[in-house]
Amino acid sequence: MHDAQVRVAIAGAGGRMGRQLIQAALQMEGVVLGAALEREGSTLLGTDAGELAGAGHSGVTVQSSLDAVKADFDVFIDFTRPEGTLEHLAFCRQHGKGMIIGTTGFDDAGKQAIKDAAQDIAIVFAANFSVGVNVMLKLLEKAAKVMGDYTDIEIIEAHHRHKVDAPSGTALAMGEAIAYALDKDLKDCAVYTREGHTGERVPGTIGFATVRAGDIVGEHTAIFADIGERVEITHKASSRMTFANGAVRSALWLKSKGNGLFDMRDVLNLNEL
């Protein structure tokens, strides 16, 4: 399917997701691990990336400077923090590198910076790189078109204790998919907190609830509730390799693109369904 190999660089190589991405890159056919990055001053600098990820010797040492490895990769994969990702984005735009962005928690200015950069480089920007989650998003659009006008819609998400943003990017993507199907703007209909005497539920709103506990990888449920029945659409992840494999698969797909902003629905061709 892919005539040429794609060389990838991994940001945050020492993190939980970074190590999974390194494993996925080393295991996936057609992909070469070209570089692995960590922050300046990290004790992991100079270590072998494959050994760091528990995947054996790779011959790629962890570096702190993108400039030092700019000749070693075609696509940069970033699941770090918004401020770091935006710095990497500027570098990739300047040097014509494709980018896979799985970082969540961007404000409107950050999202606009990604859109602007996509005029010059190819970017896959997704809240979740799991195949199953993206199929779920498509199912939510279909369900919302049929049931969304007369049901109460709630989104519940659960993640591990270390996750720093809430609601999760995936939960927000679920809300956006539902709102899009109903010709609404999520900003106008989302309810993120309920406390005290809230009064009755406002019709047409989309509620969000967040759980942070233990080592939960990721669980998301959308509820369409009517009187007498409800439909629940749920996705549960048991391993971060699901996300890592999707991200690396996206890098393969992105290799042939010159510029533009894409998401996993483009990669999986779900927009044709």
Curated annotation (Swiss-Prot):
Matching PANTHER family: 4-HYDROXY-TETRAHYDRODIPICOLINATE REDUCTASE 1, CHLOROPLASTIC-RELATED, DIHYDRODIPICOLINATE REDUCTASE
Catalysed reactions listed for this entry: (S)-2,3,4,5-tetrahydrodipicolinate + NAD(+) + H2O = (2S,4S)-4-hydroxy-2,3,4,5-tetrahydrodipicolinate + NADH + H(+); (S)-2,3,4,5-tetrahydrodipicolinate + NADP(+) + H2O = (2S,4S)-4-hydroxy-2,3,4,5-tetrahydrodipicolinate + NADPH + H(+)
Function: Catalyzes the conversion of 4-hydroxy-tetrahydrodipicolinate (HTPA) to tetrahydrodipicolinate.
Molecular-function GO term, any one: NADP binding
UniProt protein name: 4-hydroxy-tetrahydrodipicolinate reductase
Membrane-spanning segments: none
Binding site for (S)-2,3,4,5-tetrahydrodipicolinate: H160, G169, T170
CDD domains: DHDPR_N
Keywords: Amino-acid biosynthesis, Cytoplasm, Diaminopimelate biosynthesis, Lysine biosynthesis, NAD, NADP, Oxidoreductase
Pfam families in the cross-refs: DapB_C, DapB_N
Origin species: Enterobacter sp. (strain 638)
Entry keyword annotation includes Magnesium: no
Active-site annotation: H159, K163
Subcellular localization: Cytoplasm
